[in-house]
């Protein structure tokens, strides 16, 4: 007998219950809930889960709880990122990991391994007098999930900074367009710094997991806002072709979507072009049990085409991605655990 394990990632696109949102949460739930059920996930990583205020209470993820009602995920273990300042969930862009199996421990990382770099904007108006820290807002969420066979999977949930340019003082017009191309270019540059900085911090975390156990079962999931051949994901993967060091071969992370035929390999549509922005990267030990990937993109809408009055579709603008594994019934002992090297 083998243990089936399905790991999924899904950016829910601004999951919130604010009254001014169109479509409303009530309109979105009947659309999103069947999508979640179809995933049939044992571990589910979610992005863009918003927090809700209740009078006299802490911010809660009540919109997510409503979405999960009457689904298998309603009873799953749940861990989330929190705002370091308030120690509560944030109002925006929370990460969530749901698990059928026990979550043995969890943590989040925000500038713990990669301090914020300092940078002085070159196009800002008025001119900046000194370099300022470039921080990224979204933490890394890490959970150790204990499987029934005694094996432990390190699950990392990520939402990397988008390509949307960071604001540059003095370079935006009232209609939010850019006054200058150079201001836009610097905004894109700073956003790239944030995205690659998040990837660097994640890669340092991955290195520490491998230091603890060279055979770690690792799955890095989420909305990376980049395709496979771009810098942030190359930093996460750590390919031997880039490091030039064969001794690091066991520390490479492998993209699971590569077994999806290229015409169907996209999780986001923009201007008629499909892009694979959502990924599940796994360690080589995890790859041994990998059986296939699904990308549920049948109902994706093109994000450049919205209703005339800017009322958006109830579906997310990202497709969920699922990786399927079959693990042994019992935990396999490695040579190092038996006293030999």
Model-predicted segments: where are they?
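A solvent-exposed, charged loop/short amphipathic helix patch at secondary-structure junctions
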Residues: 166-192
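Stable alpha-helical elements in mature extracytoplasmic
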Residues: 28, 32, 60-63, 195-198, ...
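Structured beta-strand-rich core segments of catalytic domains in phosphoester-bond hydrolases
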Residues: 53-165
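A long, amphipathic alpha-helix that forms part
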Residues: 185-214
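Active-site-proximal beta-strand elements of phosphoester/diester hydrolases
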Residues: 4-17, 109, 152-161, 180-188
């Amino acid at each position: 007998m083998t243990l089936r394990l399905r790991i999924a990632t899904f950016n829910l696109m601004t999951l919130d219950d604010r009254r001014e949102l169109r479509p409303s949460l009530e309109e979105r739930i009947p659309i999103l809930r069947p999508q979640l059920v179809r995933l049939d996930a044992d571990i589910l990583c979610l992005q863009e889960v918003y927090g809700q205020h209740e009078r006299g209470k802490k911010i809660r993820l009540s919109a997510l709880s409503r979405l999960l009602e009457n689904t298998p995920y309603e009873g799953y273990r749940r861990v989330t990122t929190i705002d370091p300042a308030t120690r509560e969930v944030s109002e925006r862009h929370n990460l969530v990991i749901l698990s059928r199996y026990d979550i043995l421990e969890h943590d989040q990382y925000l500038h713990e391994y990669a301090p914020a770099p300092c940078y002085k904007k070159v196009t800002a108006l008025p001119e900046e007098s000194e370099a300022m820290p470039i921080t990224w807002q979204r933490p890394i969420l890490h959970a150790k999930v204990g499987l029934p066979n005694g094996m432990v999977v390190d699950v990392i949930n990520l939402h990397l900074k988008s390509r949307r340019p960071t604001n540059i003082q003095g370079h935006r017009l009232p209609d939010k367009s850019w006054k200058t191309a150079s201001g836009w270019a610097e905004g894109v540059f700073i956003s790239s710094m944030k995205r690659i900085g998040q990837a660097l911090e994640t890669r340092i975390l991955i290195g520490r997991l491998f230091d603890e156990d060279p055979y770690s079962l690792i799955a890095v999931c989420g909305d990376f806002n980049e395709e496979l051949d771009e810098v942030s994901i190359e930093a996460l993967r750590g390919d031997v072709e880039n490091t030039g060091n064969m001794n690091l071969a066991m520390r490479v992370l492998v993209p699971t979507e590569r077994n999806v035929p290229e015409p169907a390999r996209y999780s986001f549509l923009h201007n008629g072009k499909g892009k694979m922005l959502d990924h599940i990267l796994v360690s080589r030990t995890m790859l041994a049990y990998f059986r296939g990937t699904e990308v549920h993109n049948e109902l994706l809408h093109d994000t450049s085409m919205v209703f005339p009055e800017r009322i958006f579709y109830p579906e997310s603008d990202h497709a969920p991605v699922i990786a399927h594994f079959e693990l042994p019934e019992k935990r396999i002992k490695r040579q190092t655990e038996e006293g030999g090297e």
